[in-house]
Amino acid sequence: MALNFKDKVVIVTGAGGGIGKVYALEFAKRGAKVVVNDLGGSHTGQGSSSKAADKVVEEIKAAGGTAVANYDSVEDGEKIVQTAMDSFGGVDILINNAGILRDVSFGKMTDGDWDLVYRVHAKGAYKLSRAAWNHMREKNFGRIIMTSSAAGLYGNFGQANYGSMKMALVGLSNTLAQEGKSKNIHCNTIAPIAASRLTESVMPPEILEQMKPDYIVPLVLYLCHQDTTETGGVFEVGAGWVSKVRLQRSAGVYMKDLTPEKIKDNWAQIESFDNPSYPTSASESVSGILAAVNSKPADGESVLVRPPKVAVPKALAATPSGSVVVDGYNASKIFTTIQGNIGAKGAELVKKINGIYLINIKKGTNTQAWALDLKNGSGSIVVGAGSTKPNVTITVSDEDFVDIMTGKLNAQSAFTKGKLKISGNMGLATKLGALMQGSKL
């Protein structure tokens, strides 16, 4: 079935030519209302003209589509978004595509070379995304694409300015993916290889022929569709090839009384990727390191640092809603209190928290799970792993959980000491205390 964008409002920056033009044409072809933004400057950021954007709008309209031109700089992101609001009443999809090049070796780079590239790439994407953000939150829908490049992911000679800004967009995208997830706002990054006004000056003709912008567009349309759940991803794409990129971390080495000499002696092991891990969030990264250190390894021992995962036994499959008491677990008192609060103000809590928790309580060698759904309906809590994928997984001992929830143990301190392990949405973990407000045990 064809992916349809009927009545979706799409902003494409740098849409007067190259990849941006093909984005605009294809979105319009599939029913979207398109804001074609292009300042009309050169690939080095000089000059301006309305011709490029106007021609694309004319082409869209000639094919029966709907589009409007905008000639503002991406630094004036509010004006571009306002064009979408005035013309079509909203904004659903934002393609941060505009870019320039000011390539020069670092020793010859001027402040002007750096600042102009920053203003168009990093600041421009920020200004557009920020201007569109609250409109997307209100609609409970949004799709944002950041455009990085191989120069950002890996570095490239003569592109310290360009590469820095392109990597900055990866960080921005990753954070927006986390902040927007609860409001159905998805943000992904692409690193395209395609012929455009930017690349025609640095690639030979025979290579450019294989790098048509048409090969980039299908991935972007897929990522922007309302049925696509992918968010926080980084993808390299070009010439009919698509690949996902992720961070990889070596197993690492634990050393007591760390010294430069010990670093030197263990360097081969430090940089070995024989047993890598793949953290996907700051919380996973930190909790994995703390878990490794708190395991008290021997000096010089390799420590495999992975995000903590707790296997839930099959016997702990979710029970029907009802009693949340499990014999022998003091945490049952906490969950009973939470269950009462959900019954009294479930809809309010769902609106405030909007997340699903899997809480693994450890007691001796046993682990008992409770699933807390504060995302759907009026909320619910069951004994067991639940049937819905959690947004955050919390693992803690029975005693420490009770102390944290009753205010006797500081959660941040427990996390730092490795007593409290969190994977997934760290922000949701900080909201858990709200379930006990006003309650007494």
UniProtKB/Swiss-Prot annotation:
GO terms for molecular function: 3-hydroxyacyl-CoA dehydrogenase activity; enoyl-CoA hydratase activity. Its EC number is 1.1.1.35. Gene3D superfamilies: 1.10.287.4290, NAD(P)-binding Rossmann-like Domain, SCP2 sterol-binding domain. Substrate binds at S149, Q412. This is Peroxisomal multifunctional enzyme A. One of its GO terms (biological process) is fatty acid beta-oxidation. PANTHER family: DEHYDROGENASES, SHORT CHAIN, SCP2 DOMAIN-CONTAINING PROTEIN. It comes from the Eukaryota. The active site is at Y162 (proton acceptor). The gene is mfeA.
